[in-house]
From Swiss-Prot:
Residue ranges of domain EngA-type G in the record: 4-167, 176-351
GO biological process: ribosome biogenesis
Binding residue positions for GTP 2: 182-189, 229-233, 294-297
Gene from which this protein is expressed: der
Protein name: GTPase Der
Organism: Bacillus cereus (strain G9842)
Length: 436
């Protein structure tokens, strides 16, 4: 189930970023910061009491016509579109302004739950000034102070009351759910259409558990699939394609509901830094991963080109050394038929469960081949191992001292497990635990 999304929206200079930093920095324990955009403090993930959520800080909405103000307004509207709950931020010192009323009009159209926050209410005497904000039409205003951190608990409690209820997904365990992620214009939608047009067996379009998600089920060779995508990722136009930071949120939502993630690259344009960041999201999720090089038809090539491109991928994506690479062209449909078998393979690997006795035979053979490391005269001793989870395969290795498990030896053990059991396209987790 994807995490709920809160967007903080308001005119300039009402303290949105201050409240954002308060929420993610103090009153909420951070779960993770999204790489590549945290330096702008745009988007973070955290939890409040028993609720995990993602939170977006937007630029101030301004009614001016200057190009940069228009872009800020467009980006804020994208954030509103993504949000499950909107915190409408105002400034208690200024009272209700014409700009607040303009923001309110935008929020009315969103049809989203709105929590009205009146910032800069820094002492109890100022609370009597908040009642004018009822005129905005969003019910009870919540007085808060970004400077002193006052009132944030009540504000987040109210926001959490509007989080979507958890729904059960309507797909059985045998259905493989996969998503396509990548920067704009790498051909994700074209690849979806190539797959669906090729198979001609679309069952229906089913709205997913999130408002934006569109699940497209289809079947091939008695195997059911669901392509998980978001409507926003397929839209064309400057508003969506110019707001790259918010496309990250759509990708994360799709990843969270997937068994397999396809990281789509542009073979014609090559690899850029944003590709690495997006691939990092897939790796960190623990899902099975396939790297897809699209637009291969447009690449001038000889017998060495594919190998050279693959080596370049491995050099840039060292953390995805387990992910198979598929070269294809959505436009010409060349090699698209090779994709589903690879999806099947990595999905199966993602769910492999190894018998404990077989696992320990492999671990002990590995130790015999490469003795465990020592540190300050103490040697790591491995007693036994057991698998505790699948999706991804996760193993607990019981040892005498967890500090002696060097990352390089852990990597060696992972490589031996891959050699023994395959694990194509799936990360492996090893947890060292001291034996009682």
């Amino acid at each position: 189930m994807p995490k709920p999304v809160i967007a903080i929206v308001g005119r300039p200079n009402v303290g949105k970023s201050t409240i954002f930093n308060r929420i993610v920095g103090e009153r909420v324990s951070i779960v993770e910061d999204i790489p590549g955009i945290t330096r702008d403090r745009i988007y973070s993930a955290g939890e409040w009491l028993n609720h995990e959520f993602n939170i977006i800080d937007t630029g101030g909405i301004d009614i001016g016509d200057e190009p940069f103000l228009t872009q800020i307004r467009q980006q804020a509207e994208v954030a509103i579109d993504e949000a499950d709950v909107i915190i409408f931020m105002t400034n208690g010192r200024d009272g209700v302004t014409a700009a607040d009323e303009e923001v309110a009009k935008i929020l009315y159209r969103s049809k989203k739950p709105i929590v009205l926050a009146v910032n800069k209410v820094d002492n109890p005497e100022m609370r009597s000034d908040i009642y004018d904000f009822y005129s905005l039409g969003f019910g009870e205003p919540f007085p808060i102070s970004g400077t002193h951190g006052l009132g944030l608990g009540d504000l987040l409690d109210e926001a959490a009351n509007h989080f979507p209820k958890i729904e059960e997904e309507a797909y059985d365990d045998e259905t493989i759910r996969f998503s396509l992620i990548g920067r704009p214009n790498v051909g994700k939608s074209s690849l979806v259409n190539a797959l669906l047009g090729q198979e001609r067996v679309i069952v229906s379009n089913i709205a997913g558990t999130t408002r934006d998600a569109v699940d497209t089920p289809y079947s091939k060779d008695d195997q059911d699939y669901v392509i998980i995508d978001t409507a926003g990722m397929r839209k064309k136009g400057k508003v969506y394609e110019s707001t790259e930071k918010y496309s990250v949120l759509r990708a994360l939502r799709a990843i969270e509901r997937s068994d397999v993630v396809l990281v789509v690259l542009d073979g014609e344009e090559g690899i850029i830094e944003q590709d690495k960041k997006i691939a990092g999201y897939a790796h960190d999720s623990g899902r099975a991963v396939i790297i897809v090089v699209n637009k291969w038809d447009a690449v001038k090539k000889d017998e060495k080109t594919m190998k050279a491109f693959e080596e370049n991928i491995r050099a840039h994506f060292q953390f995805l050394d387990y992910a198979p690479i598929v070269f294809l062209s959505a436009k010409t449909k060349k090699r698209t038929q090779t994709l589903l078998p690879v999806i099947n393979e990595v999905n199966e690997s993602h769910s492999i469960r190894v018998q404990t006795n077989v696992l320990n035979d492999v671990i002990m053979d590995a130790v015999a081949m490469n003795p465990t490391p020592t540190h300050n005269g103490s040697r790591l001793k491995i007693f036994y191992a057991t698998q505790v989870a699948v999706k991804p395969p996760t193993f607990v290795v019981f040892v005498n001292d967890t500090e002696l498990m060097h990352f390089s030896y852990e990597r060696f053990l992972k490589n031996r497990l891959r050699e023994a059991f395959g694990f194509v396209g799936t990360p492996i987790h090893i947890i060292a635990r001291a034996r009682d």
